[in-house]
Amino acid sequence: MKSSTFGMLALAAAAKLVSAHTTVHAVWINDVDQGEGNSQSGYIRSPPSNSPITDVTSKDMTCNVNNKATAKTLEVKAGDKITFEWHHDSRSESDDIIASSHNGPILVYMAPTEKGTAGNGWVKIAEDGYTDGTWAVETLIKNRGKHSVTVPDVAAGEYLFRPEIIALHEGNREGGAQFYMECVQVKVTSSGSKTLPEGVSIPGAYTATDKGILFNIYDSFDSYPIPGPAVWDGASGSSSSSSSSASASAPAPTSAAPAPSSFTTIAKQPATSSSTEAPSTENTPSETTSTTSAIVSTTAVASTTAPATPSTTSAIASSAAPTNSVPQPSSNAGGAVKEWYQCGGLNYSGSTQCEEGLTCKKWNPYYHQCVSA
C-alpha cells in the first residue's frame, strides 16, 4: 500500500515537470492555412508557455493567462470550416502534438468577443470525448493536431472561438485535470438568422468534482461524461447547462454554405488567403468531406496527400503574415530523450532512449518518463 501510494505521489509530482503540454499554433479556414497565429501580431490570444490551467475557478480558464486582444482577426462566413492546429513545441513534422498519456476530451466554445473576453456568453458548438475505445486526444494526435468545427449561422460580428483540451492523466484526484485552451479572434461577415444562446460563464461552467473532470482513466469504464453544457443545436434559444454525452451529433444551423464539422486531418497548403487592413483595439475584438446536417462529427478520416481545394477564400484583418514570438520549450522529437520527457507507454511512438545518466521510468502503462538513474 505504501509503495502504491508513493508511486502515485511520485507520478503526480513528476508529471508537473514534464514539458508535454500543448497550445494552438495556427488555424485553417476551408482547408487554407492562415499561418502561425500564436503571437501578439497574430490572431490567437496565446499564453507565454504551453502550461495548463488546473484551477477551474480561475479567470485564466476564459482564454488562458493572456486574455488580451491581438493584432489580427480572421474573417469567416456561416458554413465555413475552421480547423484548429495544436502543437507541443512547433509546427514541424516531428512535433508530438501532446503527450500520448494526456488522454481526454476536446471541446469548442464560441462567444461574442466583448462578452467572451469578460468570461460570459460561452456556447459549446462541438465536443468529442471517448468513443469506441478511443479518446479525442488520441484522434487529435493521429490527425497531426487538427480538429474542425463549422461556423454556425449567427449574426455578423466579432467572436472568440475557444478550443479546449481536458487532459485526464491525473484526473483521478481533485484538481489534477489539466485544461489547455486559447481564444481565436474571428469576424463573421455573413448575416445569420440564428440568435446565439445566452451561453455559460467560464469560469463557472465546470467544478473540480464534475464527473468528467474528476475521472480516473486508469479504471475500467465503458463511457465518459463530457463536462459542461450540451452542444448547441443551432436553433435560436437558451444554452442548456446539463452535461453532454460522450459524443454529439446535433442539427446544423441553416446557412447558404452548409459544411460538416469534423475532427479530421487536413492536407498542408500554403497561406494564400487575401487580406485587408483593419485596426485592432483592446475592447474589440479541402480535404472534401460529405455534406451532413450535423454541427459536430467526430469520425476521423485518413489524411490526404494532395492539396485541398478551398471552397472559399478567407481573409485576415491585416496585411502582414503573423510571426511567432511566443517562447516555446525545447523539443525532444529526435535522438535521446531529455530529463522529464516521455519515453514510452501505450500509443507512444517517440524515442525510448534517454540521455546519458537517465533511465526510462514506467509510472503506469500509459506513461514512461526519463528520470535520473
From Swiss-Prot:
Region (Disordered): 36-55, 234-333
Biotechnology: Lignocellulose is the most abundant polymeric composite on Earth and is a recalcitrant but promising renewable substrate for industrial biotechnology applications. Together with cellobiose dehydrogenases (CDHs) an enzymatic system capable of oxidative cellulose cleavage is formed, which increases the efficiency of cellulases and put LPMOs at focus of biofuel research.
GO biological process, one term: cellulose catabolic process
GO cellular component terms listed in the entry, alphabetical order: extracellular region
Keywords: Carbohydrate metabolism, Cellulose degradation, Copper, Disulfide bond, Glycoprotein, Metal-binding, Monooxygenase, Oxidoreductase, Polysaccharide degradation, Secreted, Signal
Disulfide bonds: C63-C183
Catalytic activity: [(1->4)-beta-D-glucosyl]n+m + reduced acceptor + O2 = 4-dehydro-beta-D-glucosyl-[(1->4)-beta-D-glucosyl]n-1 + [(1->4)-beta-D-glucosyl]m + acceptor + H2O
Residues binding Cu(2+): H21, H102, Y180
Protein location: Secreted
Regions of compositional bias (Polar residues) in chain numbering: 324-333
EC id: 1.14.99.56
Ranges where the CBM1 domain occurs: 335-371
Low complexity composition-biased segments: 235-262, 270-323
Induction description: Expression is up-regulated on steam-exploded bagasse as carbon source compared to glucose.
Record: glycosylation sites: N347
Keyword Protein biosynthesis included in the entry's annotation: no
Pfam families: AA9 (PF03443), CBM_1 (PF00734)
Signal peptide (from-to): 1-20
Cofactor note: Binds 1 copper ion per subunit.
Protein residues bound to O2: H169, Q178
Task of the protein: Lytic polysaccharide monooxygenase (LPMO) that depolymerizes crystalline and amorphous polysaccharides via the oxidation of scissile alpha- or beta-(1-4)-glycosidic bonds, yielding exclusively C4 oxidation products. Catalysis by LPMOs requires the reduction of the active-site copper from Cu(II) to Cu(I) by a reducing agent and H(2)O(2) or O(2) as a cosubstrate. In addition to cellulose, also cleaves the beta-(1!4)-glucan backbone of tamarind xyloglucan, but only next to unsubstituted glucosyl units.
Family: Belongs to the polysaccharide monooxygenase AA9 family.
Entry remark concerning the domains of this protein: Has a modular structure: an endo-beta-1,4-glucanase catalytic module at the N-terminus, a linker rich in serines and threonines, and a C-terminal carbohydrate-binding module (CBM). The CBM domain is essential for binding to and subsequent oxidative degradation of polysaccharide substrate.
Annotated protein name in UniProt: AA9 family lytic polysaccharide monooxygenase A
Source organism of this protein record: Aspergillus tamarii
